[in-house]
Amino acid sequence: MSKLILAINAGSSSLKFQLIRMPEEELVTKGLIERIGLKDSIFTIEVNGEKVKTVQDIKDHVEAVDIMLDAFKAHNIINDINDIDGTGHRVVHGGEKFPESVAITDEVEKEIEELSELAPLHNPANLMGIRAFRKLLPNIPHVAIFDTAFHQTMPEKAYLYSLPYHYYKDYGIRKYGFHGTSHKFVSQRAAEMLDKPVEDLRIISCHIGNGASIAAIDGGKSIDTSMGFTPLAGVTMGTRSGNIDPALIPFIMEKTGKTAEQVLEILNKESGLLGLSGTSSDLRDLSEEAESGKARSQMALDVFASKIHKYIGSYAARMHGVDVIVFTAGIGENSVEIRAKVLEGLEFMGVYWDPKKNENLLRGKEGFINYPHSPVKVVVIPTDEESMIARDVMTFGGLK
């Protein structure tokens, strides 16, 4: 029998939701509540393909969930709140405590709160959503799905930093990795498209959006990933620097008189494509500017692609080869130019890709861009983290 599952992504003043019919993975409705706790909160819900928007004051997440459930009934999406069978909550950081998704109990809630020091901007906000749903829908399973969980299969040699070992033991300082739900979804989907068990494949997954991370997935398990202790590490991103020499932080502080917090803010919000180009963090703007002859915008795009290119070579070495390269997320799914730059010169690894196929895969289209004879397959897959969340609610919420 079909189940109705809510996939939830709660921010400090927002709540993103999708109602999904399982196991069909059919989207019933989706929407967004913005400006929670502020004046003129905005509630948007999709009804029969049309967006319905209302503006009203919503004081907290409990009221936001209440309004959402009322809207479901008002638009005949459900007859009764008991029609909802389970909820799945995106939680950014599960640390080492949570190697997989978990049914939420009071104890789990407490542990997520304790992990907030590892994700101070996200975990407390994710908890607001969890608490609101547990309060208003107390009789159904609620499941936490962690961005970090998929990467908990990394071996020590991949996740340890070359620091005094007691820093890891005392403070949990290590690589955690993020975007795990997306990497897991696309690796499973790539295996389906190839009609091979994921256990038999070596996959390099490139989740490239405003935030970007690359993952080495060997036999269905993450064995390395580009993000680190925080999502600041790895490749160049929209506004994040990615990897830099750590000695630059005190150097910048000395030269500019800025505090460590201010430098960290610059690395997170003023660097990456924005910092390099000086104009925008949006790849579409930079592509237009580069076409019109802006050298700095072109340079920013070149740096961005070269960092991803380098990780592909590195992860192919880590897995002693590669069978599939996956592109996903906003840029990975839509930027013909970045895919081409990233794949350039990889023929020595057995990557032969078709420029025509590359040009045709845009706006949510899924498919292969390699030539049929290419030993390494290259595939574009629109990510669907919400379906992955719903699958985990079915599994870990005991609904199968």
Swiss-Prot record:
Subcellular location: Cytoplasm
Main location group: cytoplasm
Reactions catalysed according to its record: acetate + ATP = acetyl phosphate + ADP
A Gene Ontology molecular function term of the record: ATP binding
Record's keyword terms, sorted: ATP-binding, Cytoplasm, Kinase, Magnesium, Metal-binding, Nucleotide-binding, Transferase
Keyword Transcription: no
Free-text remark on how the cofactor is bound: Mg(2+). Can also accept Mn(2+).
Gene Ontology biological process terms from the UniProt entry: acetate metabolic process; acetyl-CoA biosynthetic process
Site residues (Transition state stabilizer), renumbered to this chain: 179, 240
UniProt cross-references to InterPro entries, sorted A to Z: Ac/propionate_kinase (IPR004372), Aliphatic_acid_kin_short-chain (IPR000890), Aliphatic_acid_kinase_CS (IPR023865), ATPase_NBD (IPR043129)
Pfam families: Acetate_kinase
Residues that bind Mg(2+): 9, 385
EC code: 2.7.2.1
Active site per the UniProt annotation: 147 (proton donor/acceptor)
Gene Ontology annotations for the cellular component aspect, listed alphabetically: cytoplasm
Biological or metabolic pathway of the protein: Metabolic intermediate biosynthesis; acetyl-CoA biosynthesis; acetyl-CoA from acetate: step 1/2
Binding residues for ATP: 16, 207-211, 282-284, 330-334
Binding sites annotated in the UniProt record for substrate: 90
Assembly and interaction partners: Homodimer.
Function according to Swiss-Prot or TrEMBL: Catalyzes the formation of acetyl phosphate from acetate and ATP. Can also catalyze the reverse reaction.
Similarity-based family: Belongs to the acetokinase family.
Protein's name in the database: Acetate kinase
Source species: Staphylococcus aureus (strain JH9)
